[in-house]
């Protein structure tokens, strides 16, 4: 395929145009007075959202260079969302500000590599300052406050805080669609572990890249499954029952995997294969935990159970299983409550006997998975569009609350970045282009606060200057237009969100500034339309 190549300033400006188009669409959503963006869908009703990553995903540009620029910024939003569950719009605004200021300096003759080193040094200093400013999240009210800001809804914040209170900080919280209106919190027995589907062909929800099995059987095998011959008798029995199947094994490959994938694609039989978590003895113990939770047995030749002679009565069951590429959540296993309690007591006894900190930590993890349970937040809304948008917002808020517990909280509303940069830059000692690179970061750290002020109908530059002179932790409450103690007023952000947004934005900005050439696919011309008359003669015109 022929390629288009652009060099130097032309290349950088092409990327910048794409970035600006995407960032301008995303940044209008920032802050309590942020606007919404309507996204047209090929099928179904349009979606109305103020979530940065959802908007970024939908933007596809025609110009090849602009398209690459937009894709790079999408990466910032996606990475920040993956790590922290929020901060996508902040990351996009920071990236735009850094690139815009950086390209001005490159055009004026600054050395891009010197700028890059300066940006990296400044970001490290500001990140360190943010973490030192962070306050630990200790109370249920603080968790509720953080989640409320992310979801822009105090009821959601309170329900998430309640859920975290019930299942613990390490517990699992999932969000499900409900047929009834409003929000409900349910606590169910369940477990999550860090292994996802073996093949993406098992996905049942392509938009979220998830596999969801309702009321499945669970095959737990402490062995590798390669031959379809071993699996076939059991598959036939499960198919007759009409239920889907989750296969947990050391590995599933070869013709066994091919058979499962082909049947899933054809719609003949719904199943998913997942590698067993852990290694060695720890894997055996975790498989046994899952077996007790689901009311099944571990199929292992060590205990005289062979796969080819396994019947349905040896399989576990659950109300629901959700599998992503990285993790599996089993909700409401059909195990016997007394057996689960016995297993929990056994693990507690092992923790007391253990001398090794590492073993104790791993046993604590198993205990949390088995005893903690799963909190399910059920979401209902008047319309399908509202339901999807609300569910997405609540999922973001859950991740946000967990991020707050992990690294603490800082003043929200863009204030922490401005004040952390102020404190960090007093200690930085850089010269030449590196000092210019650091100034680019200083300029960019004002951008989120300025944008929040602009969206609230205020003058961004004036607000940023005023906040810089206030006591640390004080800033603008954009909802009321007053200057307040941000943390006391419940306007807070998880330190992890702010830090991730800054680091990811700086990473992409450095790439933009050091780009000297862009190679893009040449757009193909549309083929000419054929003669609609089919070339037949003798027709009257």
Curated annotation (Swiss-Prot):
UniProt function note: Together with its co-chaperonin GroES, plays an essential role in assisting protein folding. The GroEL-GroES system forms a nano-cage that allows encapsulation of the non-native substrate proteins and provides a physical environment optimized to promote and accelerate protein folding.
Reaction(s) this enzyme catalyzes, per UniProt: ATP + H2O + a folded polypeptide = ADP + phosphate + an unfolded polypeptide
Main location: cytoplasm
Enzyme class label: isomerase
UniProt binding sites for ATP: 29-32, 86-90, 413, 477-479, 493
A GO cellular-component term linked to this record: cytoplasm
GO molecular function per UniProt: ATP binding; ATP-dependent protein folding chaperone; isomerase activity; unfolded protein binding
Subcellular location: Cytoplasm
EC number: 5.6.1.7
Keyword vocabulary terms for this entry: ATP-binding, Chaperone, Cytoplasm, Isomerase, Nucleotide-binding
Similarity annotation: Belongs to the chaperonin (HSP60) family.
Pfam families to which the protein is assigned, alphabetical: Cpn60_TCP1
Source organism (scientific name): Nocardioides sp. (strain ATCC BAA-499 / JS614)
InterPro entries: Chaperonin_Cpn60_CS, Cpn60/GroEL, Cpn60/GroEL/TCP-1, GroEL-like_apical_dom_sf, GROEL-like_equatorial_sf, TCP-1-like_intermed_sf
A Gene Ontology biological process term: protein refolding
Subunit details: Forms a cylinder of 14 subunits composed of two heptameric rings stacked back-to-back. Interacts with the co-chaperonin GroES.
Record's protein name: Chaperonin GroEL 2
Superkingdom to which the source organism belongs: Bacteria
Record-linked CDD domains: GroEL
């Amino acid at each position: 395929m022929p390629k288009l190549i652009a060099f130097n300033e032309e290349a950088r400006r092409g990327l910048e145009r794409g970035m600006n188009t995407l960032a301008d669409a995303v940044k209008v959503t920032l802050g309590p007075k942020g606007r919404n963006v309507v996204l047209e869908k090929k099928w179904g009703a349009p979606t109305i959202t103020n979530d940065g990553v959802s908007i970024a995903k939908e933007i596809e540009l025609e110009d090849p260079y602009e398209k690459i620029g937009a894709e790079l910024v999408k990466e910032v939003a996606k990475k920040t969302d993956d790590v922290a569950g929020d901060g996508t719009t902040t990351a996009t605004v920071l990236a735009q500000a850094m690139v815009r200021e950086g390209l001005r300096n490159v055009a004026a003759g600054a050395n891009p590599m010197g700028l890059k080193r300066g940006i990296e040094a400044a970001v490290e200093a500001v990140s360190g300052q943010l973490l030192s400013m962070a306050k630990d999240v200790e109370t249920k009210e603080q968790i509720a406050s953080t989640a409320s800001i992310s979801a822009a809804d105090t009821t959601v914040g309170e329900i998430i805080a309640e859920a975290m209170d019930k299942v613990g900080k390490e517990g699992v919280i999932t969000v499900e669609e409900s047929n009834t209106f409003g929000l409900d919190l349910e606590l169910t027995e369940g477990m999550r572990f860090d292994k996802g589907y073996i093949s993406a062909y098992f996905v049942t929800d392509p938009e979220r890249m998830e596999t969801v099995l309702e009321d499945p059987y669970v095959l737990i095998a402490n062995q590798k499954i390669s031959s379809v011959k071993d699996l076939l008798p059991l598959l036939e029995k499960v198919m007759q029952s009409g239920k889907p199947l989750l296969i947990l094994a050391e590995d599933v490959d070869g013709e066994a995997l091919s058979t499962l994938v082909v049947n899933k694609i054809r719609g003949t039989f719904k199943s998913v294969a997942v590698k067993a978590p852990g290694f060695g003895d720890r894997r055996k113990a975790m498989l046994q935990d899952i077996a007790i939770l689901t009311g099944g047995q571990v199929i292992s030749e060590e205990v005289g159970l062979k796969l080819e002679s396994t019947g349905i009565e040896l399989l576990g069951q659950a109300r629901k299983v959700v599998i992503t590429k990285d993790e599996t959540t089993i909700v409401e296993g059909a195990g016997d409550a007394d057996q689960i309690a016995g297993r929990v007591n056994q693990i507690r006894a092992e923790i007391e006997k253990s001398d090794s900190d590492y073993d104790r930590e791993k046993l604590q993890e198993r205990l949390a998975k088995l005893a903690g349970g799963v909190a399910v937040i059920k979401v209902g809304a008047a319309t399908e569009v509202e339901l999807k948008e609300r569910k997405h917002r609540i999922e973001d808020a859950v991740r946000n609350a967990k991020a707050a517990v992990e690294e603490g909280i800082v003043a929200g509303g863009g204030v922490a970045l401005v004040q952390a940069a102020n404190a960090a830059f007093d200690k930085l000692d850089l010269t030449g282009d590196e000092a210019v690179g650091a100034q680019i970061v200083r300029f960019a750290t004002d951008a989120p606060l300025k944008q929040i002020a602009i969206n609230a109908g205020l003058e961004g530059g004036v607000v940023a200057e005023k906040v810089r002179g206030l006591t640390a932790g004080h800033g603008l409450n954009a909802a009321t237009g007053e200057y307040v103690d941000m943390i006391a007023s419940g306007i807070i952000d998880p330190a992890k969100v702010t830090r991730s947004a800054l680091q990811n934005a700086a990473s992409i900005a450095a790439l933009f500034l050091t780009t000297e050439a862009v190679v893009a696919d040449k757009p193909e011309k549309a083929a000419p339309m054929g003669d609609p008359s089919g070339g037949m003669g003798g027709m009257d015109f």
